[in-house]
Amino acid sequence: MSDLKFVPGQAVNVRHAMRVGAFRVAEYRLRNMAKWWDAIIAFGIGNPVLYLVSVGIGIGALVDHSTGGHGIGGVSYLQFVAPALLASAAMQGMSDEVTFPVLEGFTWSKYFFAIGGTVISPKQIVNGIYLAAFVRGIWTVLTYGLILLAFQAIPMVSFFPLILSSLLAGCGWTAVMMAVSAHIKDDDGFFAIIGRFVIAPMFLFSGTFYPLSQMPIYLQWIGWISPLWHSTDVGRVLTIGQPTQPWLMVVHFAYFVAMFIGGFAFTYPVFARRLAE
Amino acid sequence: MIVAKGLSKVYGEFRAVDGIDFEVHRGESFGILGPNGAGKSTTMKMIAAVSKRTDGELTILGKDPNLKGPEIRAHLGVVPQKDLLDRELKAWENLYIYGRYFGLSKKFLKPKVEEMLAFAQLEEKRNSKVEEMSGGMQRRLAIARGLINEPEILLLDEPTTGLDPQARHVLWDRLFRLKENGVTTVITTHYMDEAEQLCDRLVVMDKGKIMAEGTPAGLIKDYSSKEVLEVRFGTDRNEATAPQLATIAERIEVLPDRILVYVEDGDAALEKIHALGLRPVTSLVRRSSLEDVFLRLTGRSLVD
Amino acid sequence: MITSIATSMAVRIAEKRAGKFGSGVYSGRAGQLVERNFLAFKSSNWLVVISGFVEPVFYLLAFGLGIGKLIGGVTDGSGHTVSYAQYIVPALLATSAMNGAIYDSTWNVFFKMHFGKIYQAMLATSLGSLDVALGEIGWALLRGLTYSIGFMLVVAPMGLIPSWWGLLAIPGATLIAFGFASVGMGMTSFMKNFHQMDWINFFMLPMFLFSGTFYPISVFPEWIQWIIRALPLNQAVELIRGLTLGNLNLAMAGHALYFVVMIAAGLFFTTKRLTALFMS
Ligand SMILES: Nc1ncnc2c1ncn2[C@@H]1O[C@H](COP(=O)(O)OP(=O)(O)O)[C@@H](O)[C@H]1O
Ligand SMILES: [Mg+2]
């Protein structure tokens, strides 16, 4: 039997607590992620290796063979798809760390309501979740980028600009997915729907596996609204010297920024409303 | 520590809490007794400074929760009706992480977590995940979590609902200990025995309104007689017998399965019934309880 | 009234089967589970149902038509050259049969076991664990069958099924789905948390990428080819591809047998495991 001895109301330094709120939420998310470290590492490394081997010696061999060894635009097929695979991995890895946790927090375990009972504000929960996803994003682009280097799929000089632009695409996309998840009342096949109607077509029709211009015009719009295409386009300029126009580059980055701002703008009020229910 | 005046919460058209007044003082154990749907949880969420009131005034620790939510919450401990524990984390991690949300340091939390585990009698479950714990243990963990920031007020929403009798008693014992330590507590419950056991003072709530307020003993004294005689004549005959019983008591309540006769002396009343030539199938004399107070105030029983 | 009929029927069935082989695990009422799933399905989200159908179509559009232009033709097993789209259509059919079966028999079943606690309630009635296994798998097949018919209706008019043998691809896909569903449900019954469930996806991805779905496995060294041939998805792809391209050969009987063994083994372990979990 133990007794409690404390003077009520002495332990908490309110101003400090309010300042560090978002970081404490991120700390919680990272601790939670760490429980899955083996899966995260296996996916982080296994996924790129599998794709690169499969595309490189599989489809790549077919394409390079039939184009007489020129691949697309004078580079090997592997080099052509590399920026797209990297951006896609960044977007997927990062957004996984907001979609599931947000549904978990509001619908499954309702743990956000427990956090909401502490000093932490709804806004800080949003920021904390996002921050942790960002850490996951950095890990993803770094490992993926290094593996691309090892496969000689990208030139050394474009390593940092490329992982940075992929990370930006991931940030924009993740903010949007966070807003979408925040609006979900009960999952009801949510992930199957998003996965098959949004993520799969985006992955397939964003100029990932062949230039967007080769697609029928009535499908090209998918590329234009897809952050994956914007990111892939930037990436190909950086890695294989694809010609571009300055205004197009501005559009690409403006698009990422718009998604980022829009995503947060649609997330904050929903968190505030749902937590006060 | 808490002052509410005309406090209301409206969901759409529905007045879940409808203009209630109460005060909670330092060091006391304050109860809100009412049936399901009375508006207890809604009231609790407003006191916890998460749900915004629709109307009225509310001051917690001298502050307005609409303006100073985080500051108020810093000094509250909350034990929600559903435990809301993180199922991926171990018992100690649940406490630790929750403490971190209050900005507490690792140095402070390390011994604190162990102290709380001991208080909740969960030392052996320190490294268990939530799933591996019984309902009573989960609830004790939620209480320990609510105390991790050394709160001025601990809010407990139906702390023993869904627990078996043994687990309830373990929990009551813990809550007594808290009271001895001078922690102010607010408890909602729909169990009248719980309210009698744990609360210094309580309000009876129904349909969003407060029906009465006082100490458990005071309420019983004001709204019921000293003793209650429960008699059963069989389901079909209770109704018919009622008028005769009404002559020997100041008040009776006819329930579907039995009749409650409110008197000062139960045994004497039973003799009078026999003298009337009535032969109840069973009879029982007991002291009045808060259940009788509720019945008197609303015409319904607490648990349906 | 209805309950009393149901009870008396259950009792009659139980009496009829009492003493027969396997009576402890099977009461011949797997249909009840399919029925329950159908009821639940009617109120479920239709978008989810449709989504299972669109996925292979998307892949066909992207790879068959897009990359197909880059690649041109592929040499099939018997030395003929077929268009790239014709080459991947059977693989997509096999893959979607696998994906659907795995989804229904893993995630779905996992949820029911751990959150809905539906099986406990069912096994407390006259249903046995083989009923549950068969019913759940039967349901997965029904859905899978619908998807494969839908997919065939899209690709056949496009001329992507050159052989009439291709009609047999529909029962073929059902057999494949049966195999994956049985094994998938067996594996799921051993899973304790989401974490472990994640690993299923981890092993599905390489299978998808390397099983001769998008390119012939002859690009790999001989020893890797043998590993790939042992994987169920490659067996499935070869079986369906033989049918849609009309290259019948004896190896296809082997592929079919592979799935019969998978089904038997999967059912055996699932039944055993469910019995141990809920009825001991
Ligand atoms: N978020 C909400 N939206 C609409 N109605 C609600 C909401 N929360 C509670 N209610 C309604 O308010 C009433 C009081 O609920 P609650 O405070 O939970 O009661 P108690 O805790 O006393 O059982 C109930 O009728 C409930 O249906
Ligand atoms: Mg309640």
Task: Give a label for each model feature.
Chain C
Residues 1-167, 171-280:
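Hydrophobic transmembrane alpha-helices and immediately adjacent juxtamembrane helices
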